[in-house]
Amino acid sequence: MIGDSLNPLADAVRRSKVEWIGVRHEEGAALAAAGQAKLTGQLAVCAGTTGPGSNHLVAGLYEACRDHAPVLALSGDMPRKFHGTDYIQTTEPDLLFRDVSLYTETIASAAQAGPVIHQAMAAAYAGPGVAHLTLPQDVLATKAEGSVASIATLRPRPEFAANEHDVAELARRIDAVDRIVIMCGAGCRGAIEELQKLSDRLKAPLVHSFRGKELMAYDDPRWMGGLGIIGTRPVYEAVRDCELLLMVGTDYLIPTSCPTKER
């Protein structure tokens, strides 16, 4: 959302091919960026101006933080000559954004901009999660020179295969029980066929986390529904009574919704 401290950025965007989407509130901008990042897996960017403008971003950015969506948040700031003077709308953005972000930094010079922006984007992808940059107005108005690092290497996290010991241990645990439930999250995107085959092989129903609810058609016979606040009683009982809960593509953990008996 535009504001005085972001005017140099808005002018640069106006002269580029970058699309600027206006919103009515900074929290809405952060939520929209989080939604885009979750749907595409690609970095999304939002911005807020000095003081209350950037403060409002924080609430929406927790959506990206908790759901591990790659988002770059930009905070406009007063010119550097006013730092430390109790100037109007003075805040400490780096402190404010520390809890919600994986990376937060202030760009103090035009020469620093390229490397720091690249590092922030890399951090957002590596999490994935939120990276934050504070942009003083006078720095934004300064022409940056020199080469800019390529973004060709910036990608969502690579895939990793489990080591042989972990695979063998998982197989041992599966063989030792009869009642298995598979809980699916957003990390299962792109592997639905494999998930269905696993369900058939183990004769295990599929339940989903909040972000996994769109993975499969609701009339799929393997699909029981959701667990947790949006869950159903049959799902809760299936998870409560299972001997092994396989969590695939999710870090979901609400103790009141998970098995309580020691197995």
Question: What positions do the PLM features span?
Answer:
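N-terminal alpha/beta PP-like core and its mobile active-site loop of ThDP/TPP-dependent enzymes
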Residues: 1-263
